[in-house]
Amino acid sequence: MNLTSPKVSTMFFDQIITVTDHNVTWEKIQNCLYNLYGEATYNSWLSSLKFVSSRNGEVLLSVSTRFIKEWITVHYMKKILSLWQSEDKSIRSIDIQVIEERNSNFNVILKNREESNHNLGSPLDPRFTFDNFVVGKPNELAFTAAKRVAESIDPILGSNPLFLYGGVGLGKTHLMHAIAWHIVNSPSAKRKVVYLSAEKFMYQYITALRSKDIMLFKEQFRSVDVLMVDDVQFISGKDSTQEEFFHTFNALIDQNKQLVISADRSPSDLDGVEERIKSRLGWGLVADINETTFELRLGILQAKVEQMNMYVPKDVLEFLARNIKSNIRELEGALNKVTHTSLIGRSMTVESASETLIDLLRSNHRSVTIEEIQKKVAEFFNIKVADMQSNRRLRSLARPRQIAMYFAKKFTQKSLPDIGRNFGGRDHATVIHAVKQVENFIKTDSKFADEINRLKKMFK
């Protein structure tokens, strides 16, 4: 009997060699991606990619979630394909499939994503709606912009992000909550809204890093339809939080999602915040909320009294509106104190209100001297106090001098001639001209108006 060697197919061995070759290629590409994008980006997005197979010029990779797949496809796929083709010219395309890691902690959490997203943000205050926001000239632009964003299903061109800024207690948070309430209760479209403070964003980011749930953090924040971050100035000087905020911002803008941000100052004045973030915060509509006027303060008090279903004499409301100028919170707090006097049997009069609020009124009427104004304005513009009295007409000196005159007229009881005498013996006509110049610039130059608002806070 002739014994012949059996035929052994080489196909199986060819497949082993092919898979091994492609694994080596994939390792090279991973090293290239690491060197190209750096450790942070690689670990955040690309390290989760796994090689599955290669057949007929098509490479198949896998990741654990659809979100990661979409992100890599949009931001890194061209580069991955280019790197692979430089190693193997037969490769025509790369596809990514989602293979859930069912036993991983990450996916257990994702099954409860709705609950997780619900806990992602901060609770909304039911008092803060558009209906009970009192509108006046100082907040008209911010209110209109906020309502347009809330009512629009898709981001409005030129209003993404919407950036609201103004001093403490002027209504920024009220508008933020109002936007969120309107969207949540809108029957036309169910959008996922997350509202939170910048401080909470930072602490959630730190928690995610410590618990190694950073991918969950990214997916949660980058899968919302509307992200609202209050008091963004809090991330000033916090480099790693700024880095994550920057990438979250970009991811949402790329997906055409709406952002609403608030701060106590304009984007350009956010000291300690990276320039690239400040630039992006100013991409859309920047709306400031100015200090309240007498009319607006009176309107707020009247609305509050109506809401409380109480009677407060008109002269008492006018007294409060005229004397409590700092912010809306203090104004409403003053009203609450005054109304409580009726609970102990005292009538609400201007006299009783004055007695009840004596400490608050004293702080709101702190006297400011012309010398103090000159010193603070000079420090702000980095000039000498002596330049305030000099006759030099350089623009770098004349403008600060005019601003100091404007504040002297606004914050002191001095007559125009008295003010002029404190500025190198100038006459009252020069003071009037200076005040008008400053008022005109405030109306026409937003950057100038910001400087005035920042200076104004120094005298309070």
UniProtKB/Swiss-Prot annotation:
<dbReference type="InterPro" id="IPR001957">
    <property type="entry name" value="Chromosome_initiator_DnaA"/>
</dbReference>
<dbReference type="InterPro" id="IPR018312">
    <property type="entry name" value="Chromosome_initiator_DnaA_CS"/>
</dbReference>
<comment type="subunit">
    <text>Oligomerizes as a right-handed, spiral filament on DNA at oriC.</text>
</comment>
<dbReference type="GO" id="GO:0005737">
    <property type="term" value="C:cytoplasm"/>
</dbReference>
<dbReference type="GO" id="GO:0006270">
    <property type="term" value="P:DNA replication initiation"/>
</dbReference>
<comment type="similarity">
    <text>Belongs to the DnaA family.</text>
</comment>
<feature type="region of interest" description="Domain III, AAA+ region">
    <location>
        <begin position="123"/>
        <end position="342"/>
    </location>
</feature>
<feature type="region of interest" description="Domain IV, binds dsDNA">
    <location>
        <begin position="343"/>
        <end position="460"/>
    </location>
</feature>
<dbReference type="InterPro" id="IPR003593">
    <property type="entry name" value="AAA+_ATPase"/>
</dbReference>
<dbReference type="GO" id="GO:0005524">
    <property type="term" value="F:ATP binding"/>
</dbReference>
<dbReference type="InterPro" id="IPR020591">
    <property type="entry name" value="Chromosome_initiator_DnaA-like"/>
</dbReference>
<keyword id="KW-0067">ATP-binding</keyword>
<protein>
    <recommendedName>
        <fullName>Chromosomal replication initiator protein DnaA</fullName>
    </recommendedName>
</protein>
<keyword id="KW-0238">DNA-binding</keyword>
<dbReference type="GO" id="GO:0008289">
    <property type="term" value="F:lipid binding"/>
</dbReference>
<comment type="function">
    <text>Plays an essential role in the initiation and regulation of chromosomal replication. ATP-DnaA binds to the origin of replication (oriC) to initiate formation of the DNA replication initiation complex once per cell cycle. Binds the DnaA box (a 9 base pair repeat at the origin) and separates the double-stranded (ds)DNA. Forms a right-handed helical filament on oriC DNA; dsDNA binds to the exterior of the filament while single-stranded (ss)DNA is stabiized in the filament's interior.</text>
</comment>
<dbReference type="InterPro" id="IPR013159">
    <property type="entry name" value="DnaA_C"/>
</dbReference>
<dbReference type="InterPro" id="IPR010921">
    <property type="entry name" value="Trp_repressor/repl_initiator"/>
</dbReference>
<feature type="binding site">
    <location>
        <position position="171"/>
    </location>
    <ligand>
        <name>ATP</name>
    </ligand>
</feature>
<keyword id="KW-0446">Lipid-binding</keyword>
<keyword id="KW-0235">DNA replication</keyword>
<dbReference type="GO" id="GO:0005886">
    <property type="term" value="C:plasma membrane"/>
</dbReference>
<dbReference type="GO" id="GO:0003688">
    <property type="term" value="F:DNA replication origin binding"/>
</dbReference>
<dbReference type="Pfam" id="PF00308">
    <property type="entry name" value="Bac_DnaA"/>
</dbReference>
<keyword id="KW-0963">Cytoplasm</keyword>
<feature type="binding site">
    <location>
        <position position="172"/>
    </location>
    <ligand>
        <name>ATP</name>
    </ligand>
</feature>
<dbReference type="InterPro" id="IPR024633">
    <property type="entry name" value="DnaA_N_dom"/>
</dbReference>
<dbReference type="Pfam" id="PF11638">
    <property type="entry name" value="DnaA_N"/>
</dbReference>
<feature type="region of interest" description="Domain II">
    <location>
        <begin position="91"/>
        <end position="122"/>
    </location>
</feature>
<feature type="region of interest" description="Domain I, interacts with DnaA modulators">
    <location>
        <begin position="1"/>
        <end position="91"/>
    </location>
</feature>
<feature type="binding site">
    <location>
        <position position="173"/>
    </location>
    <ligand>
        <name>ATP</name>
    </ligand>
</feature>
<keyword id="KW-0547">Nucleotide-binding</keyword>
<dbReference type="GO" id="GO:0016887">
    <property type="term" value="F:ATP hydrolysis activity"/>
</dbReference>
<dbReference type="InterPro" id="IPR027417">
    <property type="entry name" value="P-loop_NTPase"/>
</dbReference>
<dbReference type="InterPro" id="IPR013317">
    <property type="entry name" value="DnaA_dom"/>
</dbReference>
<dbReference type="InterPro" id="IPR038454">
    <property type="entry name" value="DnaA_N_sf"/>
</dbReference>
<feature type="binding site">
    <location>
        <position position="169"/>
    </location>
    <ligand>
        <name>ATP</name>
    </ligand>
</feature>
<dbReference type="Pfam" id="PF08299">
    <property type="entry name" value="Bac_DnaA_C"/>
</dbReference>
<dbReference type="GO" id="GO:0006275">
    <property type="term" value="P:regulation of DNA replication"/>
</dbReference>
